[in-house]
Regions:
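Generic N-terminal targeting/processing segments that precede catalytic cores or assembly contacts
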Residues: 1-109
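Structural helix-adjacent loops and short alpha-helical linkers that scaffold large soluble proteins
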Residues: 87, 135-141, 188-194
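Acidic-glycine-rich active-site phosphate/pyrophosphate-binding loop
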Residues: 88-105, 140-159, 202-211
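Short acidic, glycine/Ser/Thr-rich loop/turn "cap" segments at secondary-structure junctions
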Residues: 106-114, 130, 160-164
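Conserved phosphate/anionic-ligand binding catalytic regions in large, soluble enzymes, centered on
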Residues: 111-126, 171-175
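Alpha-helical support elements that line or immediately flank enzyme active sites
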Residues: 124-135, 183-188
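Hydrophobic alpha-helical bundle architecture
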Residues: 158-170, 174, 180-223
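Conserved small/polar residues in nucleotide/adenosyl-binding loops
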Residues: 226-229
């Protein structure tokens, strides 16, 4: 990885170079991939658009081969539309989209591993919901996704993002931390604020084990997708 190997490195580079966190990650990715920053940004935008496509192509009729997953994302949407969700509009939409993505994964639909297939619902749910509810541009969400990617790369280098190796705290925990940093940026946080947000998110996930029913990434995995953001 170019230039940074820890969250502290990312924050210091942001402060010293007078760059926002997403710019630090973009520069590092361009260096690592031998690509222009414009091309890296375009690549990340395609990734974000793939998340959108996965959300739009959710099929409420599908069920996983085990029959344990499917249809709950639709139920959550109906509940949100009833106006009775005590969590509010934004969190309600986040929960809906996280469920949809997790169920799509269990039903063998196309998703974006972020950072893994098992945790695929967290980051898209947060970013897509923020774009929908707060009307930010797609490019702003891509910048948040770059920040999330940088955080994920640091975690993968120093620890693990695999549930099988580090428990669900490593998989859902990493996704939650990545999403928190991106969300903090869109809310106006500086690099230190983003770092604090990811730390709070990750600490709240510590201790989660990987012990799914029947060894499938369905129960409790899908429920954890919408409780972790």
């Amino acid at each position: 990885m170019a230039e940074y190997h820890s969250i502290s490195d990312l924050v210091k580079l942001s402060i010293n170079n007078k760059q926002e966190l997403w710019q630090v990650v973009l520069t590092g990715q361009a260096h690592d991939k031998l690509m222009s920053e414009r091309d890296v940004f375009a690549q990340m935008k395609k990734m974000y658009q793939a998340m959108k496509s996965a959300d739009e192509q959710y099929d409420q009729q599908l069920r996983s081969p085990s029959k344990m997953a499917g249809g709950d994302g639709y139920k959550m949407r109906i509940y949100n539309e009833s106006g009775r969700n005590i969590c509010g509009d934004f969190i309600g939409v986040v929960m809906e989209k996280a469920l949809k993505m997790g169920e799509s994964n269990a039903c063998m639909k196309r998703i974006v591993a972020a950072p893994t297939a098992g945790s695929c619902g967290v980051i898209p749910a947060v970013l897509l919901s923020y774009e929908k509810c707060f009307g930010v541009t797609e490019d702003e969400c891509v910048k948040a996704l770059l920040i999330a990617a940088g955080i994920g790369a640091v975690i993968a280098e120093n620890a693990s993002i695999a549930g099988a190796a580090g428990g669900c705290q490593a998989e859902i925990g990493s996704a939650s931390a990545m999403a928190a940093a991106g969300l903090a940026y869109m809310q106006g946080a500086d690099s230190e604020g983003c770092a604090n947000a990811l730390a709070l998110a990750l600490k709240s996930m510590l201790g989660l084990t990987c012990d799914p029913v029947c060894g499938l990434v369905e129960v409790p995995c899908i429920c954890l997708l919408y409780t972790s953001p």
